[in-house]
Structure formats: structure tokens, C-alpha cells
């Protein structure tokens, strides 16, 4: 009996060692350009990049990196591959450039939101994840960390008054595949979806919808709106919008307990009305509302 117990213990220890050895922590640090710490009990290696460059205050209180101003990424073995999860601390003008780097290098962007109210300068938090080889994931995180060290990009702006809106609604409807309504100088298109909550169907009027609101002119327009997506649609919609140079301003949920789970992203775009509509149409084609 003792020999069986001893053999089992040896095999378990060997398996644990193999599992731990799969994480090349030195390589992770090299590729990410950040120092990390191994949680041996969880077999998770976490690298951190404190935002010590930010002089942030909230209601007169000075915040330092330990108060939640540290970008990080945690790596864990997942069978023959690796899983990563992380959170990036970004100024507003860094959000979309950093998001594009993450998406273009194979990471998923899973949430974008604020952690504070009334902070100065304003900061957003972008959560990322991924599953694949250690080399590809650590390299992607390293590129994200590197982009965070660079200056942000000016946020798009335009001098537009909805009172002077002159848009070609027929053109927008043709491009988007859905007709909208003009009210108060805003041409708004709403595309409903359905989900179930508490055993009942909820749809567009209950807020389960994608919408786009245009104002301005054909040559100088602004669009803002919201995409309702299943979890499996989020990444392709994000990539389509960013490739169209449309800004992502939030990614989150509006409900709990719905089936299927519905995620929402809010966006903002400035440019020619036709270009904005075509960018949105590409993103719409990544969704399958019913």
C-alpha cells in the first residue's frame, strides 16, 4: 500500500512539475518587457506595468499605481497552450490605438469601462484575454505594453450642429440595409434583437438593439450608437469598427441572466457619412440578429 501511495505521489509531483514547467517565465518577461511574479499555488505568472507616469487625482486624492493604476497580464497553462487575461490602464486618447494593437495581434478585448468618477485626467480600463501559444500571447501583450508607453492619438472632433443636418437618408438606408427616422436633426436607425429573461422574450423596445444616430452633412458627419452582440460576435465587430476608424468608447453588459448573453459596445465616429455607414455595415454583417 505504501508503495502505491508513494508512486501516486511521485506521479502527481511529476505532473505538477510538467504543468509548471510549461510556463517559461523568463521568456514571458522578455517578450512583454515587464517583470512578473509567479503564484506557485495557482501556477499563474503575472507581469505588471505600473502607470507611474500618470499624475491622477480623484476628488483631490492623489492616486498611485497600487491604488489600481497598474496594467497587468496573467498567464496560465491551459493544456498544451497558454491562457492570458489582463487589464490595461489607459488615458482616453490611448484607448483606441491600444485596442487596435491588441486586436491586430490576436488578443481579445472583453471590456472597456471606467473605475472612477471625477478623476483627472480621465482614465479607462480595457480588459483583454487570449488563448494560444506562449510566444504569440506574450508577444502581443508586449506590443500592447509598448504602445501604452507612446503618446495617444487626438480624439476625432467636428463642428456639427444637428439643427443644420442635411443627410441623404435614402443613401444611408441602402448602405446599412435598414431604414431610419429623422428627428431633431438626427437620422437614427435601430435594429432589434431578441433574448430571453425570466422565461420571457425581450426585444428591441426593451433595449435589446443595435442603433446608429447620424447628424451633420454628407461630407462632415458624426455617428454614435450601440451594438448588441452575442459573446461570439464581439471580437469581429470590434475589428470591423476599428478598421473603419470608428472609436470604441465602452464595452459592457446591460443585463444579467439573459439567454443568450448579450454584450453591448458604444461607439463614436466622425467623417463622411457614406464612409461611416459603410464601416458600420461591415460591423453589422458580423452579427446575426433574430
PLM regions: where:
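Sec-dependent N-terminal signal peptides of Gram-negative exported proteins
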Residues: 2-18
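Extended intrinsically disordered, low-complexity coil regions enriched in Ser, Thr, Gly, Ala
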Residues: 64-66, 91-118, 201-207, 231-256
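Hydrophobic, ordered structural segments
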Residues: 92-110, 120-162, 269-288
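A conserved regulatory-domain signal marking ACT and ACT-like small-molecule sensing domains
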Residues: 71-76, 87-90, 124-131, 142-143, ...
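An N-terminus-focused feature that recognizes amino-terminal "leader" regions
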Residues: 26-86, 95
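Extended, low-hydrophobicity, polar/charged segments
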Residues: 138-140, 192, 203
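Intrinsic disorder/low-complexity detector
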Residues: 19-55, 146-192, 196-200, 288-290
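Intrinsic, low-complexity N-terminal interaction/targeting segments
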Residues: 58-74, 195-216, 251
Amino acid at each position: 500500500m505504501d508503495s502505491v501511495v508513494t508512486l501516486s505521489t511521485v506521479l502527481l509531483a511529476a505532473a505538477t512539475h510538467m504543468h509548471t514547467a510549461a510556463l517559461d517565465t523568463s521568456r514571458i518577461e522578455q517578450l512583454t518587457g515587464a517583470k512578473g511574479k509567479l503564484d506557485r499555488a495557482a501556477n499563474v505568472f503575472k507581469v505588471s506595468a505600473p502607470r507611474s507616469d500618470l499624475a491622477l487625482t480623484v476628488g483631490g486624492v492623489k492616486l498611485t499605481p497600487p491604488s489600481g493604476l497598474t496594467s497587468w497580464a496573467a498567464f496560465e497553462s491551459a493544456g498544451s497552450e497558454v491562457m492570458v487575461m489582463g487589464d490595461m490602464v489607459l488615458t482616453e486618447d490611448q484607448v483606441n490605438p491600444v485596442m487596435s494593437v491588441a486586436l491586430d495581434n490576436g488578443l481579445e478585448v472583453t471590456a472597456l469601462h471606467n473605475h472612477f468618477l471625477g478623476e483627472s485626467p480621465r482614465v479607462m480600463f480595457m480588459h483583454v484575454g487570449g488563448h494560444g501559444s506562449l510566444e504569440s500571447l506574450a508577444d502581443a501583450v508586449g506590443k500592447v505594453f509598448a504602445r501604452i508607453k507612446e503618446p495617444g492619438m487626438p480624439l476625432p472632433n467636428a463642428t456639427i450642429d444637428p439643427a443644420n443636418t442635411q443627410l441623404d437618408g435614402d443613401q444611408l438606408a441602402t448602405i446599412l440595409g435598414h431604414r431610419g427616422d429623422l428627428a431633431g436633426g438626427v437620422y437614427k436607425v435601430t435594429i432589434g434583437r431578441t433574448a430571453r429573461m425570466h422565461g420571457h422574450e425581450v426585444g428591441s423596445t426593451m433595449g435589446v438593439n443595435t442603433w446608429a444616430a447620424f447628424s451633420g452633412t454628407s461630407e462632415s458627419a458624426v455617428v454614435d450608437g450601440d451594438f448588441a452582440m452575442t459573446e461570439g460576435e464581439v471580437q469581429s465587430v470590434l475589428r470591423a469598427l476599428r478598421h473603419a476608424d470608428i472609436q470604441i468608447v465602452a464595452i459592457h453588459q446591460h443585463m444579467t441572466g439573459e439567454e443568450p448573453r448579450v454584450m453591448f459596445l458604444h461607439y463614436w465616429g466622425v467623417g463622411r457619412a457614406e464612409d461611416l455607414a459603410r464601416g458600420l455595415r461591415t460591423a453589422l454583417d458580423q452579427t446575426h440578429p433574430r
